[in-house]
Amino acid sequence: MIFHANPGVIDLGINIDHVATLRNARGTVYPDPIEAALQAEEAGADLITLHLREDRRHIRDADVRALRPQLATRMNLECAITQEMLDIACEIRPQDVCLVPERREEVTTEGGLDVAGRFGQVSSACKQLAAAGIRVSLFIDADADQIAAAAACGAPVIELHTGRYADAHTPDELAIEFRRVADGVDAGIRHGLVVNAGHGLHYTNVQPIAALAGIKELNIGHAVVAHAVFVGWQNAVREMKAIMVAARLGTRYPAAGKPA
């Protein structure tokens, strides 16, 4: 099988949040989101995205601090607009910070940031991050007013929320939501913004979004983590069995993954 990983065509940001979710579910130190990030880079990821939520439900402060100096690509840190999060971002200095809305009761980010309604707060956050040498992105709905507000508050990048497209239940609804995203891309470019997109994208719905020439980067996480369960599962089972058999026979099974 041939994988096309042409650099510069469209960037893939791998979100490692749900590797941390799996780790935290049992209170273990594995799977290690740092290792997941580094392996994603080896596999062709153009950047690593992670969301430090206020409740630390998946990614933890220590993850962000440990990962930042190890990345060969870019870190895209997602966070809410709180002074605590802005100060952490300015301390760690990822290449990119994507400001997102956040509610503790939500399972995942449910919508875009209301830049127009919170203009002063968003603008102030953009200035603080920019002063620390961090490129700022705003996670917003594909709405003309929000896109205009994002440009006005000084953010050079927007990430369009594709959740409504991903959750569409009928062909007509899908077409409407796709057009909304496509129009949002065009509007962002007219305002001189770099346009990224993400949320809810997976292996069978990403193609139309990725085909939009104006999109620079897609950030995808849960779908990749979920798919890895299946495409890597048989190898994981075989290796565990081989380790067990080797231990029973008193032979050595090297960490490289092949029996001695």
From Swiss-Prot:
InterPro entries: Aldolase_TIM, PyrdxlP_synth_PdxJ, Pyridoxine-5'_phos_synth. It is found in: Cytoplasm. GO terms for cellular component: cytosol. Its EC number is 2.6.99.2. It comes from the Bacteria. Catalyzes the complicated ring closure reaction between the two acyclic compounds 1-deoxy-D-xylulose-5-phosphate (DXP) and 3-amino-2-oxopropyl phosphate (1-amino-acetone-3-phosphate or AAP) to form pyridoxine 5'-phosphate (PNP) and inorganic phosphate. This is Pyridoxine 5'-phosphate synthase. It comes from Cupriavidus pinatubonensis (strain JMP 134 / LMG 1197). The gene is pdxJ.
